[in-house]
């Protein structure tokens, strides 16, 4: 049923080589399929200060646009999921700079707070816009590159989560009946949400084109679905206007005021004994799984490889929607694969409360990057200096 689409896509995009830095899914995955997926990378289980984590990424685009990181150490845990669009420049920039800004601001303030997190987002946005300003003459399309940004920090028993865009953090907690329950603690900044459209309309009452229904999808200015991002400079400042001959990003009139913002939604949660784990994932996962489905999978299965299990479950659902077999989907090359699903990043962070209460937990200071097999040292010791 899908062969006609695959042939068309292949003709348009051409053959593609495997991404060289993947740790390939050599055994065909943890939940069936029988064929290795060379576009799937995973770190099945690692340690953090308050428990364990599992990490997986699957590539769909010709060039992976998701960047991600987990920073571990004895003082804190940091998770970042950066879902790029229009290219990987913004997501890569966030991965290289946001955590450093967070450490610097936390040390200056001698605490971690919503204000510190907000400041780290602002500094990252300004840094990327400065990069756009410096390079736009040679690389004009960098003004159209942006990224969603989802960040989680666990510090002294408190979870701080901040997001721009439609990546999502979901807590799995035990309710009164001891049943695992999903609680989304982020807000989807996507024009498909009525409240987001109303927010945009209230900010732009004189712009009848601020949200447009195009081919059944609500888009801001008829172009983009997400309302809060890092980057997308041409939708924030007139100085970054693109050549109007570029039809994909053409605005019906010059920008009067920013139509996108980099103001994150922030949630602060004191972790309770009922909180079992947190799932951080780009929207590629949530396109195919509900919050409760994802939480049930994590709760009912072993920890090792759970992020990969979530990714594979989403891929199976993507295959089912296209009336194709999962084993056939895994044979589809990057680039062509984007016709079937998006890049997907998943980090599952387990909360072990006995560790959460300990003050002298010894955890290696490591920086784990999505789709990169080598593990480097982390700067997370910067949190140690906070009194």
From Swiss-Prot:
Required cofactor(s): Mg(2+); Mn(2+)
Documented EC number(s): 3.1.3.16
Gene Ontology biological process terms in this record: regulation of intracellular signal transduction
Catalytic activity: O-phospho-L-seryl-[protein] + H2O = L-seryl-[protein] + phosphate; O-phospho-L-threonyl-[protein] + H2O = L-threonyl-[protein] + phosphate
InterPro entries the record matches: PP2C (IPR015655), PP2C_BS (IPR000222), PPM-type-like_dom_sf (IPR036457), PPM-type_phosphatase-like_dom (IPR001932)
Pfam families reported for this sequence: PP2C
Comment on bound cofactor: Binds 2 magnesium or manganese ions per subunit.
Family: Belongs to the PP2C family.
Name of the protein described by the UniProt record: Probable protein phosphatase 2C 25
UniProt source species: Oryza sativa subsp. japonica (Rice)
């Amino acid at each position: 049923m899908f062969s006609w689409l695959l042939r068309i896509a292949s003709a348009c995009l051409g053959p593609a080589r495997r991404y060289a830095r993947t740790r390939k899914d050599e055994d065909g995955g943890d939940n069936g399929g029988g064929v290795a997926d060379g576009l799937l990378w995973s770190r099945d289980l690692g340690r953090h200060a308050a428990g364990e984590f599992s990490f997986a990424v699957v590539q769909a685009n010709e060039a992976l646009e998701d960047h991600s990181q987990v920073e571990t150490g004895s003082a804190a845990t940091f998770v970042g999921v950066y879902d790029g669009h229009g290219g990987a420049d913004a997501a890569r920039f966030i991965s290289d700079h946001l955590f450093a800004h967070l450490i610097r601001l936390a040390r200056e303030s001698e605490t971690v707070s919503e204000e510190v997190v907000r400041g780290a987002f602002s500094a990252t946005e300004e840094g990327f816009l400065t990069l756009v300003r410096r390079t736009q003459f040679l690389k004009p399309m960098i003004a159209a590159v942006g990224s969603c940004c989802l960040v989680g920090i666990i510090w002294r028993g408190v979870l701080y989560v901040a997001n721009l865009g439609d990546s999502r953090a979901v807590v799995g907690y035990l309710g009164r009946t001891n049943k695992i329950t999903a609680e989304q603690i982020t807000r989807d900044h996507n024009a498909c949400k009525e409240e987001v459209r109303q927010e945009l309309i209230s900010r732009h009452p004189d712009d009848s084109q601020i949200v447009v229904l195009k081919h059944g999808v609500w888009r801001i200015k008829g172009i983009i679905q997400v309302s809060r991002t890092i980057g997308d400079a041409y939708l924030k400042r007139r100085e970054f206007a693109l050549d109007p001959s570029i039809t994909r990003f053409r605005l019906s009139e010059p920008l009067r005021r920013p139509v996108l913002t980099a103001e994150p939604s922030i949630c602060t949660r004191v972790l309770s004994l009922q909180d079992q784990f947190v799932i951080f994932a780009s929207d590629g996962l949530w396109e195919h799984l509900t919050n409760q489905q994802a939480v049930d999978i994590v709760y009912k299965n072993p920890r090792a490889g759970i992020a990969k299990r979530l990714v594979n479950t989403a891929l199976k659902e993507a295959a089912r929607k296209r009336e194709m077999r999962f084993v056939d989907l895994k044979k589809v090359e990057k680039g062509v694969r984007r016709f079937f699903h998006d890049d997907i990043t998943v980090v599952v962070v387990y909360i072990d409360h006995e560790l959460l209460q300990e003050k002298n937990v010894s955890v290696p200071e490591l920086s784990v990057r999505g789709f990169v097999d080598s593990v480097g040292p982390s700067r997370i010791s910067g949190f140690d200096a906070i009194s």
